[in-house]
Amino acid sequence: MILYQVFSVLSLLITIYSFALIIYIFMSWVPSTRETAVGRFLASICEPYLEPFRKIIPPIAMLDISPIVAILVLRFATTGLWGLYRMIAF
C-alpha cells in the first residue's frame, strides 16, 4: 500500500513538472514573460533539464524541438516507473 503511494506521488511530480515545461515553452512565445517572477522561477527549474537535450538536438529551421523530446522522455519515465512498480509489487 505504501509502495503504491510512493509511486503515485513520483508519477504526480513528473506530471506536474511536465506541465511546468509546457507552460515554460508557451511563455517563450510571448515577449518579456520570461523576465517576470514566474518566468524566472520556471527557467530555474526547467532550463537545467532542457539544457542536455538542447546540446544533443540542434534547432531545425529555427524551431527548437528539444522540449518536445524532453517531455516525451518524462512520459517514458512515468511509464517505466509504473512498470517498475508492477515488477516490485507483483
Swiss-Prot record:
The lineage of its organism: Bacteria, Bacillati, Bacillota, Bacilli, Bacillales. The keyword Repeat does not apply. Keywords: Cell membrane, Membrane, Transmembrane, Transmembrane helix. It is found in: Cell membrane. Its main location: membrane. The keyword Transferase does not apply. InterPro entries: CCB3/YggT. This is Uncharacterized membrane protein YlmG. GO terms for cellular component: plasma membrane. It is a multi-pass membrane protein. Belongs to the YggT family. The chain crosses the membrane at residues 6-26, 56-76.
